[in-house]
Amino acid sequence: MVGGNASGWIVGKEHYDLGNDLFTLMLDPYMQYSCGYWKDAATLEEAQEAKLQMICEKLQLQPGMRLLDIGCGWGGLSAYAAKNYGVSVVGVTISAEQQKLAQARCAGLDVQILLQDYRDLHQQFDRIVSVGMFEHVGPKNYRTYFNVVERNLAPHGLFLLHTIGSNKTDMNVDPWINKYIFPNGCLPSVRHIAEASEGHFVMEDWHNIGADYDRTLMAWFERFKQAWPQLAPRYSERFERMFSYYLNACTGAFRARCVSR
C-alpha cells in the first residue's frame, strides 16, 4: 500500500470494515465491489455473475488447479471459482469483517480465506487473480506487487489483474476520496502497469470495461438509497451524504471517461 504494510491495514479498517450490513444491502449476492460486465446483462446480479464467469474463463481454470485470490473481499469470486470450476482457492484480505463473511460464504468449499498481507505469501499457484485491490498498492510498491505475484505463480501459470485505471501517469490521488473513502489509494495508468510488470509477465490480453462502471455505480446508489431506512439507525446523516456523493462522483468520472477499468 502507498506507505508500506501498515497503511494497507488502514484501508481495511476504515472502509472495508465499515460493516457487512452496508455492503450486503448495496451489492449483489456475490458481493462484488468492482465493475460488473453489462454486455448481455439487465440487472446488477447478472452483470456481476457475467464478470465472474469472464474472469474464470480468461484464467482458463481447470478442476484441480490452485487459485490465489489477492484481495478476495467477501469471497464471491473465490466461492464462484471453487463451485463452478472445481479449483482449490486461497483468498487473502486485510479486512477482518470481509474474512468473517467470506469464510461463512465459502463453508463446505475448497476455499481458505486468510487475514494476511499478500506480500507475506510464499506458495505456488497455477493461477492468480486480483480484482479491485491494485488501486490500494501505490506506485512505490508496484514492482514489489509484481515480484510477489511472480514468486507465487507456477511456471506457465496465468495472472489476471482487474483494476481501475487513470488516463494519465501521475500520482492519481483524489484528495476527497483519499480523506473520506479510500485512505492511501492511487489509480495506476497503463504506463504504470506496463513498466512495473516488465520482465515479469507477457501481456496476452487487455480488456477495458470501464464504461460499464457507470451502470454498476448507479445500481449501487439505487440499492443504497432503498436500503437507507435499514441502515439509518447505525449510520449518521453525514455518512449518508458522504457515501451518496462518493457513488455519484465516481459515476461522473467513469461517464466522462476520466478513468477506466
Regions found by a protein language model. Name each.
Residues 108-118:
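Conserved SAM-binding strand-loop segment of SAM-dependent methyltransferases
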Residues 164-260:
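Substrate-binding/catalytic lobe of Class I Rossmann-like enzymes that use SAM or dcSAM, i.e.
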Residues 119-128:
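A short acidic, Gly/Pro-enriched loop at the edge of an enzyme's catalytic core
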Residues 143-155:
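A short glycine-rich, Lys/Arg-flanked "PGG" loop and its adjoining helix->strand segment in the class I
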Residues 1-26:
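N-terminal auxiliary segments of SAM/dcSAM-dependent transferases
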Residues 156-164:
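Conserved beta-strand signature within the Rossmann-like core of class I S-adenosyl-L-methionine
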Residues 64-71:
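Conserved class I S-adenosyl-L-methionine
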